[in-house]
C-alpha cells in the first residue's frame, strides 16, 4: 500500500488555505501547505509600491514581491504572493454581510443563515483581531458629511479592521492569544497597509492562523 507524507495538501497560504490547514491540523490530520511566494517580515516588506522587486510578483522578471496581478480579458485579478497570501496586501477591512445577503431569495429559505453563521464570524473576528478604526480620518469626515446631506447618516460607521491599535509605535506582548502569539506594535496610521505593514500592527495570517500552525502544532517550515 502506498504511503503518504500528508493526509491533506493545501495549495496557498491565504485566508482559505491558512484556516483550512489550521483546523484540519487541530483535528489530527497531517497537513502540508504549498505557497509560491516567500516568507516576509517587517524588515523585508517593500517600503513603497515603487520597490518593484519586493512589491510585485513576476518571477520571470526577477520580482518576488507580495502583489500578484493576473490580467484576464475584461478584468485584472489582484492577489497576494507570500506566506499569508492576500492578507499581506489587503486593506484590513473585515465586514460582515448586511441583512439582504442572509435573506437572498436563492438561499434565504433554507435556514436562518445569520444565526447559523454568527458563531463562525465571531470566531474569525477573534482570530483576526477585528475592531473599529478608533480615529476619524479625513475620508471618514467627508463620508459622514455626505451621508448627512443624503439623509442616511445612520448608515455611516467606522471601518472594522484587523489591526492592533495600541499606543502608536509601541511594542507589546501578544494581546490576542494569551501571550502565545507574536508581539504587536501599535498602528501609526502610516497608510501602508496595502504595500505591506512594516510596523507590525496588521493582523496578517502569519500572525494568527499560520503562527499557531508553526508554533503550536510543530509545522516544519
What annotation goes with each model-predicted range?
Residues 1-105, 109-115:
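N-terminal glycine-rich phosphate/pyrophosphate-binding loop and immediately adjacent elements
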Amino acid at each position: 500500500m502506498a504511503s503518504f507524507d500528508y493526509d491533506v495538501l493545501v495549495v496557498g497560504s491565504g485566508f482559505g488555505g491558512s484556516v483550512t490547514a489550521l483546523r484540519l491540523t487541530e483535528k489530527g490530520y497531517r497537513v502540508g501547505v504549498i505557497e509560491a511566494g516567500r516568507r516576509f517580515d517587517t524588515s523585508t516588506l517593500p517600503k513603497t509600491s515603487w520597490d518593484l522587486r519586493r512589491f510585485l510578483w513576476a518571477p520571470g522578471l526577477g520580482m518576488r514581491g507580495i502583489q500578484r496581478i493576473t490580467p484576464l480579458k475584461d478584468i485584472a485579478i489582484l492577489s497576494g504572493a507570500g506566506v499569508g497570501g492576500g492578507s499581506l496586501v489587503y486593506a484590513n477591512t473585515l465586514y460582515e454581510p448586511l441583512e439582504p445577503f442572509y435573506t437572498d431569495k436563492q438561499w434565504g429559505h433554507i435556514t436562518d443563515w445569520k444565526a447559523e453563521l454568527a458563531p463562525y464570524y465571531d470566531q474569525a473576528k477573534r482570530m483576526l483581531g477585528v475592531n473599529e478604526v478608533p480615529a476619524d480620518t479625513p475620508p471618514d469626515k467627508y463620508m459622514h458629511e455626505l451621508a448627512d446631506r443624503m439623509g442616511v447618516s445612520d448608515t455611516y460607521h467606522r471601518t472594522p479592521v484587523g489591526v492592533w491599535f495600541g499606543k502608536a509605535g509601541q511594542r507589546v506582548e501578544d494581546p490576542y492569544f494569551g501571550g502565545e502569539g507574536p508581539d504587536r506594535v501599535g498602528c501609526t496610521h502610516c497608510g501602508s497597509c496595502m504595500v505591506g505593514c512594516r510596523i507590525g500592527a496588521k493582523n496578517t495570517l502569519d500572525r494568527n492562523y499560520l503562527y499557531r500552525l508553526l508554533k503550536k502544532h510543530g509545522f516544519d517550515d
